[in-house]
Each structure stands twice: as C-alpha cells, then as structure tokens.
Amino acid sequence: MEAARGRLGPEQDLSTGADHQAVTFSGRPSRTLSKPPSARTLSGEEEAESVGVASRHPRPSPKTSSGSIAHRPELDTWEDKPSARATPSGARGSRGTSGSEHTPPPSSWYPEPEPSEDQPSALTVCRRGSPGGVEMNVELPQQEGDDDDDGDDEEAADRAGHSFPSRLQDSRSLDGLSGACGGGGSSSSGEAGAGGGRRATISSPLELEGTVSRHGDLTHFVANNLQLKIRLSGAPSPVPPASGRPCLTPAPTPTIPPIDPDVLRDLERLSRELGGRVDRLLCGLGGAVQELTALSVGCIQTYRDAVDSLGEAVDMSIKGMYTLLARCEELERALQPVQGLARQVRDIRRTLEVLEALCK
C-alpha cells in the first residue's frame, strides 16, 4: 500500500459534526477545482482504524494496491461548482447502527480499474471510520461548455478508431489479421494458447460448411446440404409483427425538391423531337433497305438470264461440233473413189513415158 494513495493527506477540518464521512467526487480528468471541500482533522486512532478497515477488505487492482483514498495522478485540484449537492445517507445521531440505506458496498471503497483512453476517468475519495459512520456523496456534473476537453476526447476517439483499420491494412497475413483483431492485450494470451488450439486458416470458415480439398494452387469446396441451403435461401423472409405501441419517431420526410413544370415541358418537347427524328430515320432506313432489296433482285435476275443464255450458246456450239464431225465423215466416204482414179492416172503417165522413150 502506497503512503500517498492508501492514506489521507494532511489533517483536514470538517465543518460538520459527523465523526466519520465518505465523500465521493466524480468528474472528468481535466476538471480543476478552485478550492477543496472543508474537512476536520482526523486523529491518529481514526486514521489507524480507517487503514485497518481497508486492509480487511483487499481487492486486486490492475495498477497498484488501493487504500481508503483513490484518485488519478493527473487530477490535482477540485472544481467548486454551485450545483454540487451533499446527501447524508444516515442520521447524525444514530452512530451505533451498522449502516444506512445509501451506504455503498465494500467493493466501492476501492478504486475501480483505470478506464481506457476513450472514456473519462472518475475520481473517487472514500474516507470511512467505524461501521456506523456518516457518508456524504458529492457529485460534480460535467461542464457543457468545455470545448477543449471535448475536442481532446474526440481526437483520442478518432485516433483509436483509425488505428484498427490501419493495422488491418498493414497486415498481410492471417496471423497479422488475427493479431490486429485481437488487439495488443490478447497477444500474450494468444501466444500462450497457440499450442493448444488450431491456427486460423483461409479454409477454416469453409470447413464448417462443407468439404475443402486443395490441388496445387486450386481449392475445391463441396457444400453440405446444398439443396437445403438453396431452399432456405429462396424462402420468403417472415414479416415482423406489427407492434401495438405507436411509433414515437415521426416518419422521415422525403427530401425530393419540387419539380419545375418548365423542365417537364422541355423534356416532353425534346422527347417528341427525338421520336420524330427516330421515325424519319426508320423511314429512310426502310426505303434504303427496299432499294437495296430491289437492286439485289435485279442483279439476281440478270445473272440468271446470263446463265441461261450461256447455257443455250454452249448447247448450240456442242451441237454444231457434232454436226461438223458428221459432215467430215461423209466427205471422207465420198472421196474414196477419187483415190482409185488417182492410181489410174499415175499408171497412164508411166505408160506415156515408156512410149515416148521408144519413139526416139
């Protein structure tokens, strides 16, 4: 037990006639008081008795062991506010009773764990003597006009809120993700229990819903009860029952601005112009298609007539060739007697040549 935190400071004077008091102050860390509350001097016996009561009710604290007085080190002065109120929890004359209606439990005699950075800490001062003492609770309400403290709290909350996504973005592995989600406080417990539990992997959520198998870089997943899941996903969601209590919050008013009628008229006019242009475009496109169709039909008919004429010409040439061949055969048969006459003429010439030779 520390002397500065477990005992009261220098003797103080109490203006009231009570022998034993419990005073509780609550406020923000940055609050300051212009003057402390008045108190009377405690005797050495009462201080020893107060220390004995605190030692009989030990309570573990995350920071230091607590006594009958607990305060944060950064709060040095107290703020005197006109709205502070003191409420006696028991009669001043009844000192022999074991407690009063508002006497706090023994657990409230000791400081609570130190709050986090995002929450304002509360200062609690408990000074108790005998079990039948008088308790006074003094509350210091928060100031609404303290803009500096509110700004500091908001900046601390923003830093605490942005630190978690930044840690998630910087981590590149599942171990980093799990460490970022668990926080710095759970790192030691995670290291201690790493041997007993299974490490988180990518397929651990999939293994709960089906079978996962890996082949190289490919991961195959087979879902269990696929038909049931499809049937459940297609089922309509149940309509929540209408509550009998009327809705206290008014329905949100639509934020759609009023529509300008000139805009509607311009839109209608432009739509009509666009429709007329589209109609004219479709008509021109239809006429062009008809002209192309007629030209295609004319080309097809011309090609058909040319093919028919060419076929007839080829047929006529084939017929003339066969006719010529037939005439040549007839001529050959007609020239066969001419060859006999040619032989006779050659014989007559030889005979004439012999006769001429004899006459000389």
Swiss-Prot record:
The modification Phosphothreonine is found at residues 41, 201. Transmembrane segments: none annotated. The keyword Acetylation does not apply. Residues 89-100 have a biased composition (Low complexity). Signal peptide: none annotated. Keywords: Lysosome, Membrane, Phosphoprotein. Residues 1-201 are annotated as: Disordered. GO terms for cellular component: BORC complex; lysosomal membrane. Residues 23-35 have a biased composition (Polar residues). Component of the BLOC-one-related complex (BORC) which is composed of BLOC1S1, BLOC1S2, BORCS5, BORCS6, BORCS7, BORCS8, KXD1 and SNAPIN. This is BLOC-1-related complex subunit 6. It comes from Rattus norvegicus (Rat). The gene is Borcs6.
